[in-house]
Amino acid sequence: MAKLQWDEQGKRLYETGTSKGALNVRGAGKVVAWNGLTKVTESPEGAEETALYADNIKYLSLTSAENFKGTIEAYTYPDEFMAADGSAMIAPGVTIGQQTRKTFDLAYRTEVGNDEDGTDHGYKIHIIYNAKVAPSERAYETINDSPAAITFSWAFTTTPIQVEGFKPTSYFVFDSTKVPAATMKALEDMVYGTAEKEPKIPSPTEILELIKDITTTTTTTTTSTTTTTTTQSQG
């Protein structure tokens, strides 16, 4: 049995950065790059306990449903995002507000670093499904001796979608330090597109199909390890 070790070389991990935003507004029919994306804040809520008491003791606790929401910040946004922000273009360069807000999916990348490789250690691809943003404030100020660009900010909520074999969710994460390189490439080819294929945000069903080989390999390895251990014990 191994003794616990802390802060070993190569295991001092951290996460940073936000880049490579890919937006799919429902009904737009295409995925577009989100330039100027600066921050995605994930703020899940819910999963709150309701304690029930009986016979003068805590009998059990019920947990409320969890909701995935957050905030998106950027210096600019794709034209396609206007439909998600409640705007419509009625003529080239002319928009009106207070329209129906479309739902959207968003993929983005964050970096995984460690003490040896820095941010070259790995990365994560995050996919948010079925999101909708609320109206947000925009403050335009006069240009002065300390010029600054406006940072747009949108609070978003999500509605979970069905995932076979699991509870509904609106959030997936792929970690390149754990997912095989071939699977990560297949995912990125889907999300970012290739010379032959248009980009798309894969559905949960497509993701489950994509990772099928990983789960099969993991199950086989676990079973093999268990069998070997049992055989050695019996021997």
Please provide the spans of the model-predicted regions.
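Polar/acidic, low-complexity leader/linker segments enriched in S/T/G and N/D
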Residues: 1-44
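Hydrophobic membrane-targeting and insertion signals
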Residues: 2, 233-235
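Intrinsically disordered, low-complexity coil segments
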Residues: 20-28, 116-119, 163-167
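Oligomerization/assembly interface segments of phage tail-like spikes and tubes
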Residues: 42-44, 53-81, 146-161
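Positively charged
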Residues: 48-49
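Structured, beta-strand-rich domain cores
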Residues: 58-136
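Mixed-charge, glycine-accented linear interaction segment located at domain edges/termini
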Residues: 135-138, 142-218
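Extracellular mucin-like PTS domains
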Residues: 219-231
